[in-house]
Amino acid sequence: MNRVLYPGTFDPITKGHGDLVERASRLFDQVVIAVAASPKKNPLFPLEQRVELAREVTKHLPNVEVVGFSTLLAHFAKEQNANVFLRGLRAVSDFEYEFQLANMNRQLAPDVESLFLTPSERYSFISSTLVREIATLGGDITKFVHPAVAQALTERFKR
């Protein structure tokens, strides 16, 4: 059985992330969205809320589960019995970092392969950072995130 781990901070989860998960759910038996605590990134939403939002966005996919974690990704992959890391590449600028990360993960978890997917064209420009920035300034984010995420951001930045 192929069990893929899709790690990230997901602060917040976007339609781009959701697109990757939907496509992965057709390619793999099981998809685990691994929401990283990432305290050094000082996330906008607490881990529990990011996990809940990811669950809401993916609840229609029966072979997808969402789990929060705060350990080394290689260790978490072993705990989850994952055999693939899934990463998204929006642009060439993402590749160098992701390539370095994949090589490090290969050293730490040699039995887990790294697989890169590019986003659908309509989502290739979306990033959590840009979504947060637009929301902070009161812009319309509904084209970029699930309604539950838009609601959470609206509540967070009420003026």
From Swiss-Prot:
Q: Where does ATP bind?
A: T9, F10, H17, G88, L89, R90, E98, Y123, S124, F125, I126, S127, S128, T129
**What's the stated role of this polypeptide?**
Reversibly transfers an adenylyl group from ATP to 4'-phosphopantetheine, yielding dephospho-CoA (dPCoA) and pyrophosphate.
- Essential cofactor(s): Mg(2+)
Q: What's its catalytic activity?
A: (R)-4'-phosphopantetheine + ATP + H(+) = 3'-dephospho-CoA + diphosphate
Q: Which InterPro entries match?
A: Cyt_trans-like (IPR004821), PPAT (IPR001980), Rossmann-like_a/b/a_fold (IPR014729)
Task: Report residues binding substrate.
Answer: T9, K41, L73, R87
Q: What is this protein called?
A: Phosphopantetheine adenylyltransferase
One of the entry's Gene Ontology molecular-function terms is:
pantetheine-phosphate adenylyltransferase activity
> E.C. number, please?
2.7.7.3
Q: Record keywords: Transferase included?
A: yes
Predominantly, its location class is cytoplasm
Biological process annotations from GO: coenzyme A biosynthetic process
Q: How does it assemble?
A: Homohexamer.
| Entry similarity comment | Belongs to the bacterial CoaD family.
